[in-house]
Amino acid sequence: MTRAYLAFTETGLVLAKRLAGSLPGSVARCGQNGISLAEWTSAQFVHSDALIFVGAVGIAVRAIAPHCKSKTTDPAVVVVDECGRFAVPILSGHLGGANDLARAIAAVCGAVPVITTATDAHGIFAVDEWAKHQNCMVLEPERIKLVSGKLLAEQPVYYRTDFPVTGTVPAGLFPADTPEKADFALTLCPTGQALHLVPRIGVLGIGCKRGTSADTLEAAFAAFCTRHSLAAQAVTAAASIDLKQNEPGLLAFCQARGWPVRFYSAAQLRSLPGQFTPSPFVQRVTGVDNVCERAAVLDADGSLFYPKFACSGVTLALACRPFAPDWRWQNA
């Protein structure tokens, strides 16, 4: 988490530096070195994961108001009074991590964390905070309130998961008898009206002909997702053979998706143990019998989830990084 602290007085600056000593981040003082409240807030809203105002809540609220867009994209915002008595998360408490940050700040300076989200106030399971702790993407944030509302009303909430989850199941949660009954689901393949939490664990292995365009790769990926009912948000990176490291279309496709792409030599791919879909043609051209499956598994250091899929001269496969979810939804 990248943090940015803003103080307004010398006393506040001392506290900001103290906090940054334990919870690293940039430190600035409003009015010093030409720093204005509006400019600092505008810049840090884009570049930082968390903004910490050491001052009054009202100042922070007015500063961030023009920039607030979505609970899924807004950074965490916490306000700490300059005497370090209270730490108040005011934006992105769960998905952005502001509640956890307020608790961490409180632990450093002895403040009281002032947590006002309803699930925290009642000490009950917060599905969006759980998703963040399990490195999952929330596909339908508007459905969070439906799950939380049931728990707050002491109604049963049903879940389904495609992965074993360790630990004690939180109060009020019960496994769904059928997929249709689930209120939320931990899955790579969302279906139905549940709130879907998608683990960010996928690596897309890619093979393609020379000169393949980004548009062709995008169309192939869309077809791949449709074939498997896969949420595109599950993919976090791509991998291929080093023969493709200068392919403009491949690089542009990955850049547009925001994925890092890593390349491996034929020798590295050949050295990977396991059963993969062989191709004599690919063997002749690249020196290894399969590119997409091997590259995905090697990069993920995990297991093959979906095997080779061919479309318009493109081959794709999905491997998943090790994933061991538990029922923890807050930092200890």
Where are the model-predicted features located?
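Conserved mixed alpha/beta catalytic, RNA-binding, or beta-rich assembly cores of soluble enzyme
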Residues: 12-18, 34-36, 44-99, 104-108, ...
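C-terminal non-catalytic interaction/assembly regions of soluble proteins
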Residues: 241-294, 300-304, 310-314
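N-terminal basic/disordered segments at the start of proteins
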Residues: 1-26, 305, 312, 319, ...
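A short beta-strand-loop structural module common to alpha/beta enzyme folds
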Residues: 25-35
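Conserved phosphate-binding catalytic cores of ATP/NTP-utilizing and phosphoryl-transfer enzymes
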Residues: 40-46, 184-185, 294-301
